[in-house]
Amino acid sequence: MTLLDTEQALLAIHTVLQLKLQQRRTREELENQGIMPPLKSPAAFHEQRRSLERARTEDYLKRKIRSRPERAELVRMHILEETSAEPSLQAKQIKLKRARLADDLNEKISQRPGPMELVVKNILPVETSLKEVIIDVDYPEVVDNSSFDEDSSDALSPEQPASQESQGSIPSPIENRPSETTQIPALSPSHAFSCVQFGTDAFNQDSLQSTAITISNGLTASICKSLPALVKQSQPKPSFEKSQRIKKPKEPKPKVKKLKYHQYIPPDQKQKGTPAMDSSYAKLLQQQQLFLQLQIINQQQHQHYNYQTILPAPPKPLPDQQNTNSSSTTTVRSMSTVAPSTLATPTITRQNSNVAVGGRTGPLPHNLDEMKVAELKLELKHRGLPVSGTKIDLIERLKASQDPSTATAASAKPTPVQQAKPPEVVPIVSSSCLTTREPIKLCSTSSTPPGSPCPSEVSVVSMDEVSMISDALGETVACPVTQQVQQNPAAEKSPPDARDKDLMLREKDRQIEELTQRLKQKQELVERLRQQLEQEKRTPQHSTDDQQALILAVKQEPLPLTVDSINKKASSIVKQELNTAIICQQEPQLLIGPVSSGIEGKVDNSAGTKLVFTLTNPSSQLPEENRQIVLQKVPTPPSSLHPNNSLPKQEVLLSCCALQNQKPALQLVPGTVLSLSSSNLQPMLNMNGFQKWHGEALDSLQKQLVHNESPATPPQQPEPEPPPHSIFLTHSSPQWSKNPPGYDEAMKQQPNSCEDGRPGCLQAVDFFDVLIKNLDIPSEFKDYLVPCLKQTSPSHQAAQMVPQVEMAPPPSPIHSALGRLEDFLESSTGTPLLRGHQDGPSSMPLIDDLHSQMLSSLAILDHPPSPMDTSDLHFSPIGNSLGLDISEPPLDGMDWLELSEPPAMNLTPLSTFTPSVFSTDFLDSHDLHLHWDSCL
């Protein structure tokens, strides 16, 4: 803004102020008007102010007079009297007053609301009995004033005078209601019961038009008086009545607000002065309240059912009552020989039902303090006691009313009412079924506890209430009643589940007992086999015809049998036959025996090193010519043995038998060595194939597993890194490249490498000499299975490729992935491996009970030259099987038959699949400890 603009603005303001000063009144004018006090004579100033006020008042009156209506208008408005009026002043005043009131009343009547609005606003009071007769609807609270005319607001009861001038003589609705409600409790219950009319003939509709009708609390109200004349009264009276009625209706509203949404008060306990509502809204509200009552009744039934099971049994009932309870779980009760006539009216509620049935009461629940107020009131209603007061008063009233004498009498009350014949179920669907002339039978779907012959009162009373509710609701409330009837079957289905559980437990106990019996039988069989081993040890050169098995025994040991591991998993084994595992203490032992089904293995390390290996038995038959075993001469990976190793005493059992109708052939291509050492092993492996990694893969897996399991124990002698080799245990058709060599030729080809004179090596050599001599096994088999016979350089071993081992499958496609070492042995010798119990279900005594617990693991290893080196074995299943990584801490090199107890090592599952024959759910990975000790 520039300086020029500022000057222009100031100039404009100056001009405005100058104009205002020119138009300002002088001081004299201000003094004359009383705005400013005069400078002189203050007394004159005050007098002047009074004169100004008088002048102002006069001016106001003059304006009013100028604006007043004409005389004719005042006469028309009855403010001024007419010139022809009576000379008496009192008569004129009365006439003017009446005319004025009449005009006011006519104007209000022309603008008055309709009758429904008057009822909603509680301006038009109507008695309950009058409503039932005039309206004739199903709900006592519903008010339908469509039959009223516009003059019904001025209706007076017959006791009231027709013309009343003063306000005090007009009885208000509030004054009428207490007089009606206070007369009802004055009657005794016996009088109230006598007033209720029973009989089937009272169901007709004519009872609604009778002079004596039943109101909501079961009492009869005489309405012999004629209906009040609904005529318009004289004009002076209604203004006072109107003014009083406009002021009074606000008083009863707080009584309605005291009701809570979860408290249901039946119509017989509601005051008649409750404000009426619209018919449609009242119907909805009534239905909601009745549905809420149904829910409360259902809760009370279930709670009372639970309490009844704890309370002592009531006195012994009649014989017919016992017959009724034994014939059906539903208790059928007949209210009386005739149905109550008041069921046709919708106002009958649980109070009438209790009176009709006989005031049934029952034992109190124990936890009264935990019950809700509504539940306590319901118990009080069942006993006919008042329900008013606080919760403590209700509890004390219930405790005072329930003593042993009353409890006994109350429990014996319903017995005369109950029927002795088989129950008839009459479903209550709507009020139409109650209009028959037959006795009404109510079925209680909430059955009493089995131990209590006396039925539950709450169930019967609640069904009586349901019948009343269905009478009030009609077909609309039929669904909740049927739902209540259908609730109990769901509760009755729970006992079969418990029975099924008991049956399952008993079945499992029976299975455990059977397994224990079979375990004992197999223990006897193992003892017999041990004796045979001892005999064969003393006479190892007998002919094949006299021998039952080939035995090489070094030490005699007891063969205890453990059942704990079988019992641990017996609950998860349902349809699999189990065979026991042979568990040896003190010294390590290896047993390879026949199996009836499945692949199993078990090791228990509680007392000593124990290991059991089995391979599955093919379920097919092979021709006789396939029973021979031919080993081919192929290059084998050499191994270096520690010269100072000494083999401990061991007992190795290799038995052969030919199973019935099963003659499988097993093809073994030599070039690998089985190296097994026992540990805490309980796996189940599907021996579809093995894969071993050497070189880089071996080192990486070895370092990873050693780091995970025992980080403080690294491999002491790492091996060189040759290219990785793999060994697969596969199945192929029985094809051989050449005929097996003779015994003499095999003995010539056998290297003589037992110069160290170790006892373990000599025992192995002697053992395989016996095998070769009696079973016609080529001598190459001893080269590949006895590592002490060959010693080569580590570099030669690293450079050699590992050949394959093939196991010929049987023709059966189901078990084609399974091979057994026992089949290999029994197909070679034709003699049974185990004697006894072959005809029964436990003829395979070593395997059947181990199918769900473990599976033998055959390690086809090409071990590195260093005896301190660790080896990893990776199982690569061909089908759906379990892959495992097995790592081993540094151990001393020993023979392949040596079983030792080195530090524990872990068997970690790489992946979990569902096996083709068994389930991997039985695997316990934390128990899979496997020791592999091979030295080639």
From Swiss-Prot:
Chain intervals with Low complexity compositional bias: 404-416
UniProt keyword annotation of Cell division present: no
Biased composition range(s): Polar residues: 160-170, 729-738
Family annotation (SUPFAM superfamilies): SAP domain (SSF68906)
Motif Bipartite Nuclear localization signal positions after renumbering to this chain: 62-100
Biased composition annotated in UniProt, kind: Pro residues: 712-725
Family annotation (InterPro entries): Myocardin-like, RPEL_repeat, SAP_dom, SAP_dom_sf
Protein location: Cytoplasm; Nucleus
UniProt keywords, alphabetically: Actin-binding, Coiled coil, Cytoplasm, Nucleus, Repeat, Transcription, Transcription regulation
Protein name in the entry: Myocardin-related transcription factor A
Start-end of each RPEL repeat: 15-40, 59-84, 103-128
Annotated Pfam families: RPEL, SAP
Major localization class: cytoplasm
Residue ranges of domain SAP in the record: 368-402
Cystine bridges: none
Gene Ontology annotations for the cellular component aspect, listed alphabetically: cytoplasm; nucleus
Coiled coil in keyword set: yes
Gene source species: Xenopus laevis
One of the GO BP terms on file: actin cytoskeleton organization
Domain notes: The N-terminal region is required for nuclear localization and the C-terminal region mediates transcriptional activity.
Region of interest: Disordered: 146-185, 234-258, 401-422, 707-755
Example of a GO MF term: actin binding
Assembly and oligomerization: Interacts with srf, forming the srf-mrtfa nuclear complex which binds the 5'-CArG-3' consensus motif (CArG box) on DNA via srf. Interacts (via RPEL repeats) with globular actin (G-actin), thereby regulating its subcellular location and activity of the complex formed with srf.
Transmembrane segments: none
